[in-house]
Swiss-Prot record:
GO terms for molecular function: arylacetonitrilase activity; hydro-lyase activity. Optimum temperature is 40 degrees Celsius. Keywords: Hydrolase. Residues 5-290 form the CN hydrolase domain. The keyword Hydrolase applies. The lineage of its organism: Eukaryota, Fungi, Dikarya, Ascomycota, Pezizomycotina. It catalyses: a nitrile + 2 H2O = a carboxylate + NH4(+); 4-chlorophenylacetonitrile + 2 H2O = 4-chlorophenylacetate + NH4(+). This is Arylacetonitrilase. It comes from the Eukaryota. Signal peptide: none annotated.
Amino acid sequence: MACPIRVAVTQAEPVYLDLAASVKKACGLIAEAAQNGAKLVAFSECWLPGYPAWIWARPVDFELQTRYIYNSLPIESEAMELVKATAKEHSIAVALGFSEQSPSHSIYISQAIISPQGEVVMHRRKIKPTHMERTLFGDGSGADLNNVVEVDFGAEHGKIKVGCFACWEHTQPLLKYHSISQGEAIHISMWPPIDPSAGVDHPGLWSMTADGCQNLSQTYAIESTAYVLHSTSVCTQKGIETLKTQDGLSCRQPGGGHSCVIGPDGRRLTAPLGDGSPDAEGIVYADLDLTKVVATRGFLDIVGHYSRPDLLWLGVDREQKENIIAKQHKAAEQEAVQG
């Protein structure tokens, strides 16, 4: 049996709408996590260059939208190379949440898992952006269903299956079932800054609050019997002023940070950072005993002994759908067959 593996979950504010400064801060957090013994560090949804919370305050903002696109991260870029190099230098895996800029300047809610060797071993886009997110972000495609990858942590810990989802993907039963079928042992649950509930008169949905979102992460842990790294970010008063969200449903007040680690039976394993204030910045650490994943699956394995595929099953199309598909002429097709 491999020894316990230390993981790190960030609870930090990006430099909103500033990709270069946010990447610099991310690299500092990666180094800090590694120096404290972590072998995997998780960031929150769209941490680069920050979650665009103004979408929950007003229907459109051309100025901020344009600025956001320019500061979103292309997967092939110097900024991504810097993050990869930092992971390799410190021999730590990184689960990165970012706004991805495509060559045509469309943007997507994306996630990447970078190995301790500095390679992007998994890159995916959120299958369906949530509600107002669709005013900015495009959809994922079939290949983005592959959200779990085996990460090589070296001789001490071996290869471990790590997966991730963004935010309300944790409400999607079919998507979750497909993810769980891939056998992850560690799951990164990425969220934006999330506000506490104001009670029965809360202006939004309880499922969008800190308690509601943690509930979804804990439910995923129970269903998957995997450890869940519940990663959230922070929005200070400076962030509110940058995003102009003081009158919105999200980031109305400083806070948003509720990061924690959840066990494979759904229990919360870590205390809040500092004094528990949601505007506290830092890193949450936990040492994971992966034998507890196996022990829990002895009771509950919804893609194994606790399933009935003869009665209920899931169909999946993992093909990537492209905008341009070259038509192959009949002569070329015949030549290919004859060859």
